[in-house]
Swiss-Prot record:
Residues 397-411 have a biased composition (Low complexity). The keyword Nucleotide-binding does not apply. Belongs to the BUD4 family. It is found in: Cell septum. Residues 247-267, 305-324, 368-391 have a biased composition (Basic and acidic residues). CDD domains: PH_Bud4 (cd13278). Keywords: Cell cycle, Cell division. This is Bud site selection protein 4 homolog. GO terms for molecular function: GTP binding. Residues 185-416, 428-455, 862-902 are annotated as: Disordered. Residues 277-289 have a biased composition (Polar residues). Residues 1128-1239 form the PH domain.
Length: 1259
C-alpha cells in the first residue's frame, strides 16, 4: 500500500507539472507565432512541443550554438520524460513489432532519482539499486557505449551522472538518437539529425562535448521525440497507445502557425523541405519520380537484428516541401510564354469553381507537392491522373466553358487531353466548341483527381491541335479566321509493364531495374499496403507524384496502429515475387508531319515597305492578321511575332506584284510563292533554295534596286539563322544537303545521330575551308640547339644534350620542327572508324598475338549474361577471356599485315648502339691528354655523349645507346661526328746530333777526328700538329649514313652490327710552302679516312597506336627475358571451377602453360575451354574476398562456407571465375604460379614475341 500511495503521489505531482508546462508552452508558442518572420534567420533554438493524452508526457527538440569554435558549432539534443516503468518491456516489444523501423526504445534507459523514497525503490532494486549505491549499472554502461559509437551520427549521449542531476521527475527517458515523429501531424516539425562526421565529433560540424557538459545545455522544459513506429507506453499499470486523432494533437496542430521557407505563415501546414534529398544518380530521373528502392535508410544500417531487412516508410523520402497552390498569376505566367511561339494571342481558360476554395489551405486537407511538379513544363502529363483514369477512379471529365459576354469573341472548351480519345482531340479547335460537350458541367473536378490536374487543364488550352487541312472556323461570334494550334505530343508510358517480355528498348541512361538487392518483393508489397493505409487519412506528407500513393477521399481515417497491423497482415499473407518494373523518364513522341512547320523557326524577311504596306491587301487567299487591339492580354514577344508575320505577308504581296510586272528575281519569287497560308510560315523548300546563294551579297548594276535590297537582307539573315535552321532540321531527323555542305557531320561532334552515321571532317575538308593556306614555319624556330646537362642511367657522368628524342632512357629537348605538327589536323575526338584494325586494342592495349577469342558455339552453350557480336571467322584480335579448345589453328594464329598502316603516329623506333672506335689517325695521344666524344645528329635533334679519355692505342669502347623515331614523312639522315679535346704541350723533345772530338794519339800531329752523338733536348714548340687536324669546335672526323628501306628490312626485329668509316674533313695543309700562313688561313686537305666506328642497329616497327617501346635495347632484352620466364611457368592438377563457360560447380583437370589455363574433362582429359590469363586483373583468396567484391549473380556466404579454400580470378570485363583445389598445399602452389603469371602480364607487347623468335637476335 505504501508503494502504491507513493506512486500515486508521484503521478499527481507529475500531472501538475505537466499542466504548468502545457500552459507555458502554449503562451510561448503564441509569442513565437507573432515573431515568426523576425526570428526566421537568427533563431538559435526552435523547440517543438507535443502534448499527448497518455504515455509519454512531453517532448522537445533543442538546438544550441557554441561560439567558442570557428565556425560556431550547432548542437541538437532532446530530453524525454515518462512515468512508465516498463521501458525494457517496451523496447523488447518494439524490436518484435516495429516491422523494421528504428525504435527509440533501443537507446532508452530509465534513470531513477536518488532522493526517491526507499519504499518505492524496494521492488525495483534490480535496476535502481546500483544507482543508489553509486555503482553504474550495466545498462548505463551500454548507453554510454552507444553514445560513443553513434557520436559520428550527430547525436550526443548522456551519462548516468548527468541523468541523476534531474532530481524532480522519478522516470526520465533520454533518447540517444531522435527518430521521426510518432504520428502524421508531427512529421513536419521534426528534422532527424543526420551527419557524416567521424567518431567523437559533435553534430553539425561542432566540437566534441563531454558527457558531463552536455546535460548542462539541456533546457528546463523536458520534451520527447515522436517516433515513426508504433510505441507502447505503460502508464498507471495499463497498456495504451497514442492516437493520431488525439484532441490535444489536433488542437496544437490547428493553433500553431509555422513559418515556411518562403517567409509566409501557413496555418496547419507542417511540410518542411528535406535538404538531404538528392536526385537519383543511378537512374538520372527527376525528384518527383523517385521510388522507394532508390533510397536506403540511414538508421537501418545501424540495426543488428532482423528489423534491418525491413524498409521504413520514411525510406521512401516522400518530399515534405511546403508548396503554394496554383494562383491566377501562376496560370498567367505558365500560359502566356508558352503560347507566344504560335503567333496567336492565347485565351485564358476559365477558372474552376472549386479553384477559389482550394486557395485557402485547411488543416485537414494539405497536399504537399514536390518542387519539381510545380516548376514543370506546361502541358506535362500527370502520371497520377492517367493512373486514376485507367483504374476507373476518374471517369468524370473536367469541362468548363467560359461564360459568353457582350464583347467576347472567343469561347474556350477545356478538357484534359489524357481523358480524350483521338477522335475527340482532332475535333477540338481554338474558338470552336466541341459538338457533344457544349453543356457546362457544374462538377469541376472529380474528388479523386489530384490537384496537379487543374494545372494541367489550365495550361493545355494553348497546345490544342492545329491541322493544316482543317476548314474555316465555325464560330459565329467573329468574322476573322482563327489559326488552329498543333497537336499535343504523345507521352510515353511511365511504366513499362511489358518488360521483360515486350520490346526491350535502349534505356541504359535513364532507367534501372529494381532487383532483389535493392528492394525485396516481400518488403515491396508490405510498403505498398502500408502506404495505401496511411494515405487513406489526410496527411501532410502526401505526395501526388509518388508511384505508390493513391489518394482516396471519402473513406474513414485509420490510426497508425491499424496501419501497422494491416501491413503486417498483408506481409504475412503475400510472399510471392513481383515482376520488376523499369521506372524512367517519359519520352515525348512528335508527329513529324504535323509539327514540321511548328518546330521550324520563322525565317525573318525585311523590306523597305511603309506602314501602309504592312497591312494585308485584299487579295483572295491572303491570311488575315489578328487585330492588336482585340488582343490586350498578349505578351510583348507575341506582338513582335505578329508584326513579323505582317511583314512577311506584305513581302508576299509585294513579290506577287513584282511577279505580275515581270521585273523580279525568278528564284526568289518561286521560293516566296511556296508560303504556307494556313501556318503563316515559309515552307522548308525555301531554306534549301536560299542556302544555295552566296554568303555575301553580289552587287549587280543592271538589276532593280529593290530586288538587290531584298536579296541582301535575305542572305544576311541566312547567315544568322543557319544554325537555328540546322538544329531544327536535326531535331526532325531530316538533313538538308545544301545546309550541311561544309562539314558533313552532325552539329555536336561527340553526339550520336538519330538518323544514321555521319562522316567526320577530314583533312581535305579542313584544307578546303582554309582556302589552301598552309601552315608556314619560321626557319629561326625550326631547329633549336640548346645545351643542357643530363646524367646517364648507369654512370654518374655528364652528357651534353642538344637535339635528340632520348638517350639512355631520358627524354631530351624537342625542337619546333615540322614533325611536331604531323598530327595537327587529326580529329579532336577520335572515332572508331578513324583507326582501322585497332578496335581490339581498346581494353588491354595489347597486340594481336596475345588476345584469345570466344567461340560462338561456346557462347551459346555457356549461357553467359553478356552477349558478344557473332563473327564469321574470329581472329586473335577479337578474343575474350576464354576460348574453346576445339577451334581451328588458323583462327588461333594472327594474320600477317600485307598493306601499310596509315593510321599510326609513326613507323616505330630504330635503336643505335655505338660499340666503339678503332684505328684513330692521331699520334702522341698520351702527351696531349686527349678526350673524345660522340655527337649524334638525326636531322631534327642533336645529342652529344660525355667525354671519355682516349687511350694510347687509339681504339676505345663507347657502349652508347640511342633511339630514333622513324616518321612517316621521310627517313632520317644520320650524321655521327667524333670530337676531341686536348692540351697542347708547351715544350717538345728534339733529337740533335753533336760532333764530339776525339783525342789524338800522336800528340797533336795529324788531323783531329770527331764522332757524332745524338741527344734529346726540350725546347719551345713552334706549332702543334693537332692544331691542323682538329677544328676549333673539336670536330675531328665524321660519317654520314642515309637510312633507307633496305637497311630497315635487314635490322627488323633483330640486332645487326655495322662498321662505318670516319672521314677527316677538317685537316689543313701545313707543308713548307704554306708555312708562313696562320692555321686558319691554310687550305683543307681532301677528306680521308681517320678511323672506324662500330655500330649495332635494331628496328622495331609499330603495329598499334597503343604499343609502347623501350628506351634502349638493354631494357628490351630484360622485357624479353621476363616474357621467357612467364612462358616457362607450367603446372597441372584437379580443381573445382564455377564461372566462365560453366555456371555450375564442376571438377576439371587444368594445365597451365604460360598465359593459357586449359580446362580438361575430369575423366577423358579432353580439352573443354582455354582461359586467357592476359585479361586477368587480380587474384584474391578467401581471406581477401568481401561481399562487395562479388557480383550479384554469385553466392556470397555459401561460397565462403562450402568453398573455404577457394580463390577467385577477376577479369577486365567484370567476369569472375572461382577455383577450389583439393588440398591446401595445391591451393598455395596454384596461387603462387598464377600470381606470377599475372604480374608478368605487363611485359606483353606486340613486338616482344617477334623479337624473341628472331634467330639472329643476341640476348
Amino acid at each position: 500500500m505504501d508503494e502504491q500511495s507513493s506512486g500515486q503521489d508521484v503521478d499527481q505531482s507529475l500531472d501538475t507539472l505537466l499542466k504548468e508546462i502545457d500552459l507555458k508552452m502554449q503562451l510561448r508558442d503564441g509569442e513565437e507565432g507573432r515573431r515568426a518572420s523576425a526570428q526566421s534567420e537568427g533563431s538559435l533554438r526552435l523547440p517543438a512541443v507535443r502534448m499527448l493524452e497518455r504515455g509519454m508526457v512531453a517532448s522537445a527538440s533543442h538546438k544550441s550554438v557554441t561560439f567558442d569554435e570557428e565556425p560556431p558549432s550547432v548542437h541538437e539534443y532532446s530530453v524525454v520524460m515518462d512515468s512508465s516503468a516498463g521501458t525494457s518491456e517496451c523496447a523488447e516489444e518494439e524490436r518484435e513489432g516495429a516491422d523494421g523501423y528504428e525504435c527509440a526504445a533501443d537507446t532508452m534507459r530509465v534513470l531513477y532519482d536518488e532522493d526517491t523514497d526507499s519504499s518505492c525503490m524496494g521492488s525495483e532494486r534490480a535496476l535502481a539499486g546500483p544507482a543508489a549505491e553509486g555503482i553504474v549499472p550495466e545498462g548505463y554502461k551500454e548507453a554510454d557505449l552507444l553514445g560513443t559509437e553513434r557520436a559520428g551520427s550527430g547525436t550526443p549521449s548522456l551519462s548516468y551522472d548527468d541523468a541523476a542531476g534531474l532530481g524532480s521527475p522519478p522516470h526520465v527517458i533520454f533518447t540517444i538518437k531522435p527518430t521521426s515523429p510518432l504520428n502524421a501531424y508531427d512529421r513536419g516539425s521534426w528534422e532527424p539529425l543526420q551527419s557524416n562526421t567521424a567518431m567523437d565529433t559533435p553534430p553539425r560540424g561542432g566540437t566534441a562535448v563531454s558527457q558531463h557538459g552536455l546535460f548542462a545545455k539541456a533546457p528546463k522544459l523536458p520534451a520527447i521525440p515522436s517516433p515513426n513506429s508504433r510505441r507502447r507506453v505503460s502508464y498507471a499499470g495499463s497498456d495504451s497507445y497514442p492516437s493520431d486523432d488525439s484532441a490535444t494533437d489536433k488542437r496544437s496542430l490547428t493553433d500553431k502557425t509555422v513559418p515556411d521557407n518562403r517567409g509566409e505563415n501557413e496555418r496547419g501546414g507542417f511540410g518542411y523541405e528535406n535538404s538531404d534529398r538528392n536526385p537519383s544518380i543511378e537512374t538520372g530521373t527527376t525528384d518527383e519520380y523517385q521510388s522507394a528502392g532508390e533510397y536506403k535508410s540511414m538508421s537501418s544500417s545501424e540495426a543488428n537484428d532482423d528489423s534491418k531487412t525491413e524498409a521504413s516508410v520514411e525510406d521512401l523520402r516522400i518530399s515534405n516541401k511546403p508548396q503554394r497552390d496554383t494562383t491566377i498569376q501562376d496560370l498567367h505566367a505558365t500560359t502566356l510564354p508558352r503560347s507566344s511561339s504560335t503567333l496567336i494571342p492565347p485565351a485564358l481558360p476559365p477558372l474552376d469553381p472549386s479553384f477559389f476554395g482550394r486557395l485557402a489551405r485547411s488543416p485537414s486537407y494539405s497536399p504537399i507537392r514536390d518542387r519539381g511538379s510545380s516548376e514543370g513544363s506546361v502541358g506535362e502529363h500527370d502520371s497520377s491522373l492517367e493512373q486514376d483514369h485507367e483504374l476507373g477512379m476518374g471517369q468524370q471529365s473536367a469541362r468548363t466553358n467560359s461564360s459568353a459576354s457582350g464583347n467576347s469573341s472567343d469561347s474556350v472548351m477545356v478538357k484534359p487531353l489524357s481523358l480524350f480519345s483521338n477522335s475527340q482531340v482532332d475535333s477540338l479547335h481554338l474558338g470552336a466548341p466541341a459538338p457533344d460537350n457544349s453543356t457546362p458541367n457544374k462538377e469541376a473536378l472529380p474528388s479523386a483527381c489530384p490537384p496537379d490536374a487543374m494545372k494541367s487543364i489550365g495550361t493545355q488550352t494553348s497546345i490544342l491541335e492545329d491541322k493544316a487541312e482543317s476548314g474555316p472556323s465555325q464560330s459565329s461570334a467573329t468574322s476573322e479566321k482563327s489559326v488552329m494550334l498543333p497537336n499535343f505530343p504523345r507521352f510515353e508510358s511511365f511504366f513499362d509493364d511489358s518488360y521483360p517480355f515486350g520490346h526491350d528498348s535502349d534505356r541504359s541512361n535513364n532507367s534501372v531495374s529494381y532487383s532483389k538487392r535493392t528492394l525485396k518483393p516481400s518488403n515491396y508489397l508490405s510498403i505498398w499496403h502500408l502506404q495505401e493505409a496511411q494515405m487513406r487519412h489526410d496527411s501532410p506528407a502526401f505526395s501526388a507524384n509518388s508511384q505508390f500513393s493513391c489518394k482516396m477521399v471519402g473513406e474513414s481515417k485509420r490510426t497508425s496502429l491499424e496501419s501497422s497491423r494491416l501491413s503486417a497482415k498483408y506481409e504475412s499473407r503475400f510472399k510471392f515475387k513481383f515482376k520488376p518494373k523499369l521506372v524512367s523518364r517519359r519520352r515525348i513522341y512528335y508527329n513529324k508531319d504535323q509539327w514540321r512547320n511548328f518546330q521550324e523557326p520563322p525565317t525573318r524577311y525585311y523590306s523597305n515597305c511603309t506602314e501602309s504596306d504592312h497591312i494585308s491587301s485584299d487579295v483572295p487567299g491572303t491570311p488575315v492578321s489578328p487585330s492588336i487591339k482585340s488582343r490586350n492580354l498578349c505578351h510583348g514577344r507575341t506582338r513582335g511575332n505578329m508584326k513579323m508575320v505582317e511583314r512577311v505577308n506584305s513581302l508576299c504581296s509585294a513579290n506577287e506584284r513584282l511577279s505580275s510586272a515581270g521585273n523580279g528575281d525568278e528564284t526568289f519569287l518561286s521560293a516566296s510563292s511556296n508560303l504556307d497560308v494556313t501556318s503563316r510560315r515559309p515552307s522548308v523548300d525555301i531554306i534549301s533554295e536560299i542556302s544555295t546563294k552566296d554568303l555575301l551579297p553580289k552587287i549587280k548594276q543592271d538589276s532593280d534596286g529593290f530586288n538587290e535590297l531584298i536579296k541582301t537582307f535575305v542572305d544576311h539573315d541566312e547567315q544568322s539563322q543557319q544554325t537555328d535552321s540546322t538544329i531544327a532540321s536535326y531535331r526532325r531527323g531530316t538533313r538538308d544537303t545544301t545546309i550541311y555542305h561544309i562539314w558533313e557531320h552532325s552539329i555536336q561532334e561527340n553526339s550520336i545521330s538519330d538518323y544514321g552515321n555521319s562522316p567526320t571532317a577530314g583533312k581535305g575538308t579542313i584544307s578546303k575551308l582554309l582556302d589552301n593556306h598552309e601552315v608556314e614555319f619560321d626557319g629561326k624556330n625550326s631547329f633549336v640547339t640548346g645545351l643542357g646537362i643530363i646524367k646517364k642511367t648507369d654512370q654518374d657522368s655528364r652528357v651534353d644534350v642538344l637535339r635528340i628524342d632520348s638517350t639512355q632512357g631520358i627524354e631530351a629537348i624537342q625542337s619546333f620542327s615540322p614533325y611536331s605538327y604531323r598530327n595537327a589536323f587529326d580529329p579532336v575526338t577520335p572515332t572508331k572508324s578513324a583507326y582501322h584494325g585497332c578496335e581490339a586494342l581498346q581494353a588491354s592495349q595489347m597486340g594481336t598475338p596475345f588476345r584469345p577469342a570466344i567461340s560462338t558455339t561456346l557462347q551459346a552453350q555457356s549461357g553467359l549474361g553478356h552477349k558478344r557480336p557473332a563473327v564469321e571467322r574470329p581472329t586473335t584480335a577479337q578474343l575474350g577471356n576464354y576460348v574453346s579448345a576445339e577451334m581451328s589453328p588458323e583462327v588461333q594464329e594472327p594474320a600477317e599485315e600485307t598493306k601499310k598502316r596509315t593510321d599510326l603516329q609513326d613507323n616505330g623506333q630504330l635503336y643505335f648502339v655505338f660499340v666503339g672506335i678503332e684505328q684513330l689517325a692521331l699520334r702522341d695521344i698520351e702527351r696531349h691528354s686527349a678526350e673524345c666524344s660522340i655527337e649524334f645528329d638525326n636531322g631534327n635533334n642533336v645529342v652529344q655523349s660525355e667525354w671519355l679519355p682516349l687511350p694510347k692505342s687509339g681504339s676505345m669502347s663507347l657502349n652508347q645507346e640511342y633511339s630514333v623515331i622513324i616518321a612517316e614523312e621521310s627517313l632520317p639522315n644520320m650524321i655521327i661526328t667524333l670530337k676531341c679535346r686536348y692540351k697542347s704541350p708547351k715544350k717538345e723533345l728534339v733529337e740533335i746530333t753533336e760532333k764530339v772530338p776525339l783525342k789524338s794519339k800522336c800528340c797533336g800531329l795529324g788531323k783531329p777526328k770527331y764522332k757524332q752523338v745524338k741527344k734529346l733536348l726540350r725546347r719551345e714548340m713552334d706549332f702543334d700538329e693537332w692544331d691542323y687536324k682538329i677544328a676549333q669546335d673539336g670536330s675531328f672526323a665524321r660519317c654520314k649514313e642515309q637510312i633507307d628501306e633496305e637497311l630497315l628490312k635487314n635490322v627488323r626485329y633483330k640486332k645487326q652490327q655495322f662498321r662505318w668509316t670516319l672521314l677527316s674533313e677538317w685537316e689543313r695543309d701545313h707543308s713548307k710552302e704554306h708555312k708562313r700562313k696562320r692555321a686558319w688561313e691554310l687550305p683543307r686537305l681532301p677528306a680521308h679516312p681517320a678511323g672506324a666506328l662500330v655500330v649495332d642497329m635494331c628496328y622495331l616497327p609499330r603495329t598499334s597506336r597503343f604499343e609502347k617501346f623501350p628506351k634502349t635495347l638493354q631494357i628490351a632484352r630484360r622485357v624479353v627475358n621476363k616474357f621467357k620466364e612467364q612462358k616457362a611457368i607450367a603446372m597441372e592438377g584437379f580443381m573445382w571451377q564455377e564461372g566462365g563457360d560453366t555456371e555450375v560447380l564442376k571438377r576439371r583437370y587444368f594445365t597451365l602453360n604460360g598465359t593459357q589455363l586449359v580446362a580438361h574433362h575430369e575423366i577423358t582429359k579432353k580439352p573443354k575451354a582455354m582461359i586467357n590469363l592476359l585479361r586477368v586483373e587480380k587474384l584474391l583468396t578467401e581471406a581477401e574476398i568481401s561481399r562487395e567484391m562479388l557480383s550479384s549473380s554469385s553466392r556470397c556466404f555459401t561460397d565462403l562456407v562450402l568453398l573455404h579454400e577457394c580463390f577467385v580470378l577477376f577479369f577486365e570485363n567484370g567476369e569472375e571465375i572461382m577455383f577450389n583445389p583439393d588440398t591446401k598445399t595445391e591451393k598455395l602452389e596454384w596461387i603462387e604460379k598464377l600470381r606470377k603469371v599475372i604480374e608478368l602480364n605487363r611485359f606483353h607487347q606486340p613486338w616482344v614475341k617477334k623479337f624473341l623468335n628472331s634467330s639472329e637476335n643476341i640476348l
